[in-house]
Curated annotation (Swiss-Prot):
PROSITE patterns: UROCANASE. GO terms for molecular function: urocanate hydratase activity. One of its GO terms (cellular component) is cytoplasm. Pfam families: Urocanase (PF01175), Urocanase_C (PF17392), Urocanase_N (PF17391). Pathway: Amino-acid degradation; L-histidine degradation into L-glutamate; N-formimidoyl-L-glutamate from L-histidine: step 2/3. Its EC number is 4.2.1.49. The keyword Lyase applies. This is Urocanate hydratase. Gene3D superfamilies: Urocanase like domains, Urocanase superfamily. Signal peptide: none annotated. It comes from Mycolicibacterium smegmatis (strain ATCC 700084 / mc(2)155) (Mycobacterium smegmatis).
Length: 552
């Protein structure tokens, strides 16, 4: 086959590959490009500006062809979205090993990356686009929910009721924000330059409505805040223009953040450029476009800082907008914190982070069965119980039915083995894929996001995600990935991911138990090594071996 075409993962229990160990990555690769999931499927772009599932359509076809014939003792190697080899390994080895977007340090810049990309030598994999475990906007909703819940506890008495959150960016990642705010009881006003994105989030029930204009949006959002009602309003506009205007008007904003695609300046629309002219301008004059984008980001960040000066809770949501504003000469850009040091790091110290699963059958009933099972498994986790109830009521599936929640060390392995038992007993009709975002407690080096302001100054130490990937590879993962630049952009992060498959066999149970113990265990030891007392307590309580402590 040649060129773009609609892609949808097979459903049901009939294999198109030799085993579920290869059927799973095959279906998940295709699921990433399902039109319900992908932002621009014809271009192989899944989310996050230019995050791709495959380098080109020829590479996609070659990966599909290889996965359908791959044996249970073979491993396919993928170099930036292109299959480059198959080797004989063993049944405990991953069926797929993936490396995306990785560049040597001095060459790790956007201009150099784009030059190499234009030559057909690499692609941008984001985090879950090139690692084939994207589940639509739901994939980020849980983490976003956790973040806003933590902000509510820190600043607003445990709820966002009676508050108004202002944010920008309603794409595949940012589109999670309005639902996360309303699940925490608050009102949300979200700005995006693309009306189609806003309409899509309404269709998928992540956003409640799109206002006619800014005046209409402000009126509705402020009224909702006053009534202490959970409701979200989208408005078409450029955040770099809307944020300062709302500040000028004195709109009562309680919380401010942003999830525009600021990590890649070519994916951030500067002031004064129309959506229609965007792609052509960025392609023909990338340097000039980048400079204008950074100047606009500085305007937006200035407004965010001034909202903070006025008393609002403000945080960076991990898209590098502060650093881009700094590049443009704004010297107060880092006066508000990133979301991880502000709210999430205590959970990382417990090895707690994203745990997602997908029903390969395509049957929503299988996810409903797992929902019931996981709520029974952790009956005393109030935050999880609240999340699961909200997710079941509010979240629409995109592509294959999926679910996500946050679990910690000593919990993920129990859930994985339980899901495998459900498959073995026939309570779910086909195997379950179990993975996570690369944003996790021990799988990322990202000084502007996950590892910002580490206690020991180890923000930029990138050994940890590499050790994480090596650990997953040797612990029974079905596919493992190492990426560069996800979330915050080229030159700013190294991160790893793993995916396992619950197919109901005893071998799968052994693999999942080991994999889902060791993977969050990396988060515990990473934070022990950095000197976090809570991580030290967790390691002692749960028997995580720390060699440097064993001689004490």
């Amino acid at each position: 086959m040649e060129g773009a075409r609609p892609v949808r993962a097979p459903r049901g229990t009939t294999l198109t590959a030799r085993s579920w160990a290869t059927e799973a990555p095959l279906r998940m690769l295709m699921n990433n490009l399902d039109p319900e999931n992908a932002e621009r499927p014809d271009d192989l772009v899944v989310y996050g500006g230019t995050g791709r599932a495959a380098r080109n359509w020829a590479s996609f076809d070659a990966m599909v062809r290889t996965l359908t014939t791959l044996r249970e003792d073979e491993t396919m190697l993928v170099q930036s979205g292109k299959p480059v080899g198959v080797f004989q390994t063993h049944e405990w080895a991953p069926r797929v090993l993936i490396a995306n977007s990785n560049l040597v340090g001095d060459w790790a810049t956007w201009p150099e990356f784009r030059r190499l990309e234009a030559m057909g030598l690499t692609m941008y994999g984001q985090m879950t686009a090139g690692s084939w475990i994207y589940i639509g906007t739901q994939g980020i909703v849980q983490g976003t929910y956790e973040t806003f819940a933590a902000a509510a506890e820190k600043r607003f008495g445990g709820t966002l009721a009676g508050t108004l959150t202002l944010t920008g960016g309603c794409g595949g990642m940012g589109g999670a924000q309005p639902l996360a705010v309303t699940l925490n009881g608050g009102a949300c006003l979200i700005v995006d330059v693309d009306e189609a994105r806003l309409r899509r989030r309404v269709e998928h029930r992540y956003l409640d409505e799109v206002a006619d204009n800014l005046d209409d949006a402000v009126t509705k959002a402020v009224a909702t805040r006053k009534d202490k009602r959970a409701w979200s309003v989208g408005v078409v506009g450029n955040a770099a223009e809307v944020f300062p205007e709302l500040l000028r008007r004195g709109v009562p904003i309680d919380l401010v953040t942003d999830q525009t695609s600021a990590h890649d300046p070519l994916s951030y629309l500067p002031i004064g450029i129309s959506v229609e002219d965007w792609e052509d301008y960025a392609t023909k004059k990338p340097d000039e476009f980048t400079e204008r984008a950074e100047e606009s980001m500085a305007v937006q960040v200035r407004a965010m800082v001034e909202f903070q000066d006025a008393g609002a809770e403000v945080f960076d949501y991990g898209n590098s907008i502060r650093d881009e504003a700094r590049k443009a000469g704004y010297d107060r850009a880092f006066e508000f914190p990133g979301f991880v040091p502000a709210y999430i790091r205590p959970q990382f110290c417990e090895g707690r982070g994203p745990f997602r699963w997908v029903a390969l059958s395509g049957d929503p009933k299988d996810i409903h069965a797992t929902d019931e099972a996981i709520m029974k498994l952790f009956p005393d986790d109030d935050r999880l119980q609240k999340w699961m109830r909200g997710a079941r009521e509010k979240i629409s599936f995109q592509g294959l039915p999926a679910r996500i929640c946050w679990l910690g060390y000593g919990e993920r392995d129990k859930a994985g083995v339980l899901f495998n038992d459900l498959v073995a007993s026939g309570k779910v009709s086909a195997p379950i894929v179990i993975g996570r975002d690369h944003l996790d407690s021990g799988s990322v080096a990202s000084p502007y996001r996950e590892t910002e302001a580490m206690l020991d100054g180890s923000d930029a130490i990138a050994d940890w995600p590499l050790l994480n990937a090596l650990t997953a590879t040797s612990s029974g993962a079905t596919w493992v990935s190492i990426h560069h630049g996800g979330g915050v952009g080229i030159g700013r992060s190294i991160h790893a991911g793993q995916v396992g498959v619950a197919d109901g066999t005893e071998l799968a149970a052994q693999k999942l138990s080991r994999l889902l113990t060791n993977d969050p265990g990396m988060g515990v030891i990473r934070h022990v090594d950095a000197g976090y007392e809570r991580a030290e307590e967790i390691a002692a309580e749960r028997g995580v071996r720390i060699p440097m402590r064993e001689g004490e």
